[in-house]
């Protein structure tokens, strides 16, 4: 006995109806995947640094990602640089100060950043929790710092407009032969009044200049030959007897 469904004045076999539904679902899924893959738009490609955008120009929420590849023989140099808060204005674009105001352990910290924007724009501040995820498996070897917005962790400061929304990440994955791919991503609402076109120009520059300066900073002598026992990385400062942290580690924050 064939089960049928009534479609207006026509009778459609249930098997055919199910086939139509499954086909529509498959088309929708493929369309969604294609849209997601096309969300990132390349807006700048210079000095081996690619900057991508993922938002409408008029949107309050701005999303930018910078990616670069380079040689990094001492991976602990990145941790050493991130430990050096006074150095942040030298490489983190628009940041003019960075401080740690709370710590739940050596791998979980709360940070405050202030930014100095060109006149007549008001200066901003960000209050963030910095967490790190370290993955060391056969398929992936990476360290990624996640920045989570915590705007209520400190009292308001009348000298700054606090970012109402902000998340980000900074880290690298190994490519082999001491090559790494470094990523810096920002998703934020700048708060207050900033014309959309100005915000787009300013924020588009942030990933580029941050990565360009970071590449130079981590090669400086003061950041070489360090070792942090909470990170399973490569570097000449790592003792030969240092134990591995395991095949896969999830930590919070790459500074100590």
Enumerate the predicted regions with their spans.
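Compositionally biased non-globular segments, especially hydrophobic aliphatic-rich helices
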Residues: 5-8, 26, 32
């Amino acid at each position: 006995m064939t089960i049928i469904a009534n479609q207006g004045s026509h009778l459609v076999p249930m098997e055919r109806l199910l086939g139509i539904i499954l086909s529509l679902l498959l088309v929708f899924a493929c369309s969604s995947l294609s849209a997601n893959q096309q969300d990132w738009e390349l807006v700048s490609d210079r000095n081996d640094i690619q900057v991508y955008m993922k938002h409408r120009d008029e949107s309050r929420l701005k999303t930018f990602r910078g990616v670069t590849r380079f040689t990094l023989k001492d991976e602990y140099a990145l941790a050493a640089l991130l430990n050096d808060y006074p150095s942040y204005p030298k490489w983190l674009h628009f940041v003019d100060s960075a401080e740690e105001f709370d710590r739940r352990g050596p791998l979980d910290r709360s940070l405050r950043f202030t930014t100095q924007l060109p006149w007549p724009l008001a200066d901003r501040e960000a209050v963030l929790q910095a967490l790190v995820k370290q993955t060391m498996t056969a398929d992936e070897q990476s360290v990624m710092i996640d920045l989570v917005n915590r705007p209520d962790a400190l009292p308001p400061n009348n000298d700054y407009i606090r970012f109402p929304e902000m998340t980000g990440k900074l880290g690298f994955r190994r490519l082999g032969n001491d090559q790494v791919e470094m990523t810096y991503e920002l998703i934020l609402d700048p708060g207050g009044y900033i014309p959309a076109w100005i915000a787009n120009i300013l924020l588009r520059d942030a990933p580029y200049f941050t990565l360009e300066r970071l590449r130079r900073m981590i090669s400086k002598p003061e950041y070489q030959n360090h070792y942090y026992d909470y990170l399973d990385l490569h570097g000449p400062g790592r003792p030969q007897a240092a134990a591995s942290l395991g095949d896969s580690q999830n930590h919070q924050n790459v500074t100590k």
